[in-house]
């Protein structure tokens, strides 16, 4: 799925100003100021912070490409040591991105929103669009009192991952740069900043107010106050966070409530860089998709810095309000987040402008062709997922419309599809015991696993799509369903045909925490929390549920997930139950809407696989689950 190579050739001779440069395909110069090493991990308790680690090394370097590549590649990850690159990896294809790009699905029909401390600087060459492009970039001016609305280097690196264009003007229609392409290079991208102050001493830390956070999220979720003609975003990325692991602060409640009331707008948030520390908000929210970071040779190794601590659950109806500490997994998915080369903004604003020690980085005019190296953090894992969602919705727009099939665009469906299509990461463990029962559902660092867009697309488009109601809903080998279940109810799903051989199986169930947003007060409120469970059964010869082979039964999470590396041949089914409510302040919640998605992969017998390998041609391709 990805290439790995050693960088050929020496660096070019140093320029007179001390910088080393290399001509890329005779049309592209890259340079990087690398003088100071700074590694930041978790958040300062007093401040919000973008969730990243940055390394700025102590020399100048040029980024090199591999000889013979066609240029239609992606963001790089690589190890840079002692003045040379040890290796480079093209990151986007690891997640199945290239199939979308080569098929012409590059996000052109979608809008991505990015909300964090500062704004994206769209003056970098990574954001140059081809002549005649009908999509582009815009900045939302935060109207909250004290909002700085400043350009920031961190937002610019995140924007590169989301929708870097990579277009280089030139003869014959130009070309795409190796370093420029983001996940959705033709999507519209709108940026908003929430900071009212940047720290002078702690790089990346910033302060906010309730209004400075809530107003841009309200605008993006509801599609108000954006650039003329710009539709509300299909997905919002949040690469920042701080505190509130119970997701009950004013900001967190508002974001979660807006996500529930506007389900066609997916919200993706970075999990944090605290290692074993608790996942913080907005990623700790219930109605978002929280993303952890991956590294390693195949990007299946959980990053050591990626936050994995269990989040809290606050029950407002219990004893006047009770906080249950460390009772739920907050991470939903994982994506690459290590050693990335990303667009550099070196202007006198945002985090760098406020810093008391990094003034030497500031350049005027701001160079348009420089890249930060060795960028780590869940801040970058999240936009890989957000950009991936834009690609899925771009394809969806060629199949359905939001009006004709609104459930297909629902965040609960998108989240379940991505989980069902996720690949097992190294050391993945969701607490399934010998009887395949789990009260945890997800792995603490990577959730359901590594995002795999190819498998997700198979689940989303190729299988069942919103199954008709019946006594038992009939399923093919992959697909999704959305339904509304009454309190105390149980809905059954059965595979149309039996598995003829051992089969790998993923199944994901998601629903929303009931939180409501008040447009008059700009606040969110906690209303109710439903407790659904997910069971997997083997059927008997008459098609009846005979023996339960697994169950995901969390108490304080709104996700259930099961992974079977192999179930024996036979016919199977799922059962979704709505057993109880953890609380209901309204005393009016009698049903809950959910999304279910699943994926199966037949496992060939060793003898059959041996014959294929022995012939010298591997004809079988196992879908990654």
What do these predicted ranges mean?
Residues 69-209, 229-235, 245-248, 261-264, ...:
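Subtilisin-like serine protease catalytic core
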Residues 410, 415, 493-495, 524-528, ...:
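C-terminal edge strands of extracellular/lumenal beta-sandwich accessory domains
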Residues 54-63:
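Bacterial N-terminal signal peptides
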Residues 237-239, 267-272, 291:
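Active-site neighborhood of phospho(di)ester-bond hydrolases with catalytic His/Asp-centered motifs
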Residues 342, 349-356, 530-569:
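Exoplasmic/lumenal beta-rich domain surfaces
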Residues 437-530, 590-601:
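Secreted peptidase-domain scaffold signal
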Residues 28, 33-44:
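Short, positively charged and aromatic/hydrophobic N-terminal segments
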Residues 605-621:
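A short, hydrophobic C-terminal helix/tail in secreted or cell-surface proteins
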């Amino acid at each position: 799925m990805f290439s790995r190579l050693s960088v050929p050739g020496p660096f070019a001779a140093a320029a007179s100003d001390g910088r080393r440069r290399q001509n890329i395909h005779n049309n592209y110069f890259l340079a990087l100021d690398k003088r100071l090493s700074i590694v930041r991990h978790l958040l300062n308790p007093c401040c919000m912070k973008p969730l990243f680690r940055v390394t700025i090394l102590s020399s100048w370097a040029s980024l090199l490409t591999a000889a013979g590549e066609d240029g239609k590649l992606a963001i790089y990850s690589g190890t840079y040591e002692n003045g040379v690159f040890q290796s480079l990896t093209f990151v986007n294809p690891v997640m199945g991105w290239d199939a979308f790009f080569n098929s012409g699905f590059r996000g052109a029909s979608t809008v991505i929103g990015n909300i964090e401390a500062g704004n994206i600087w769209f003056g970098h060459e990574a954001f140059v669009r081809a002549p005649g492009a009908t999509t582009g970039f815009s900045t939302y001016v935060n109207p909250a009192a004290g909002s700085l609305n400043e350009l920031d280097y961190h937002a610019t690196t995140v924007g590169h991952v989301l929708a870097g264009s990579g277009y280089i003007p030139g003869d014959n229609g130009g070309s795409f740069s190796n370093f420029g392409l983001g996940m959705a290079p033709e999507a519209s991208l709108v940026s908003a900043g929430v900071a009212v102050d940047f720290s002078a001493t702690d790089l990346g830390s910033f302060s906010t107010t309730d209004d400075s956070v809530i107003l841009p999220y309200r605008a993006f979720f509801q599609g108000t106050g954006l650039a003329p003609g710009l539709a509300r975003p299909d997905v919002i990325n949040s690469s920042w966070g701080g505190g509130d692991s119970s997701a009950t602060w004013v900001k967190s409640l508002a974001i979660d409530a807006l996500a529930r009331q506007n389900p066609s707008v997916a919200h993706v948030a970075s999990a944090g860089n605290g290692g074993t520390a608790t996942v913080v908000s907005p990623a700790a929210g219930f109605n978002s998709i929280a993303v952890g970071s991956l590294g390693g040779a195949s990007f299946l190794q959980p990053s050591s810095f990626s936050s994995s601590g269990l989040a809290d659950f606050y029950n407002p109806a219990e004893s006047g309000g009770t906080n249950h500490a460390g009772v739920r997994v907050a991470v939903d998915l994982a994506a690459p987040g290590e050693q990335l080369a990303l667009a550099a903004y070196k202007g006198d604003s945002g985090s760098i402008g406020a810093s008391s020690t990094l003034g030497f980085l500031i350049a005027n005019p701001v160079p348009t062709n420089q890249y930060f190296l060795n960028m780590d953090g869940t801040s970058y894992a999240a936009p890989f997922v957000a950009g991936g969602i834009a690609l899925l919705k771009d394809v969806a727009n060629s199949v359905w419309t939001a009006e004709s099939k609104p459930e297909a665009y629902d965040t609960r469906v998108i989240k379940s599809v991505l989980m069902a299509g996720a690949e097992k990461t190294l050391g993945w463990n969701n607490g399934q015991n010998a009887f395949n029962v789990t009260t945890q559902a997800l792995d603490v660092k990577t959730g359901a696993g590594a995002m795999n867009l190819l498998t997700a697309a198979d689940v989303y488009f190729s299988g069942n799509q919103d199954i008709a109601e019946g006594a038992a809903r009939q399923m093919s080998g992959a697909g999704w369903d959305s339904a509304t279940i009454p309190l105390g109810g149980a809905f059954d799903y059965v595979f149309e045909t039996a598995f003829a051989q051992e089969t790998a199986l993923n199944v994901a169930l998601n629903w929303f925490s009931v939180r409501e947003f008040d447009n008059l007060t700009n606040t969110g409120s906690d209303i109710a929390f439903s407790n659904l469970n997910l069971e997997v059964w083997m059927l008997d010869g008459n098609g009846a549920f005979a023996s339960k082979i697994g169950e995901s039964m969390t108490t304080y999470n709104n996700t259930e997930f099961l992974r079977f590396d192999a179930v024996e041949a036979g016919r199977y089914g799922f059962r979704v139950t709505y057993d109880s409510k953890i609380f209901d302040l309204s005393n009016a919640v009698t049903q809950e809407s959910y999304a279910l998605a699943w994926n199966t992969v037949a496992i060939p017998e060793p003898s059959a696989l041996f014959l294929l390998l022995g012939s010298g041609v591997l004809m079988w391709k196992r879908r990654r689950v």
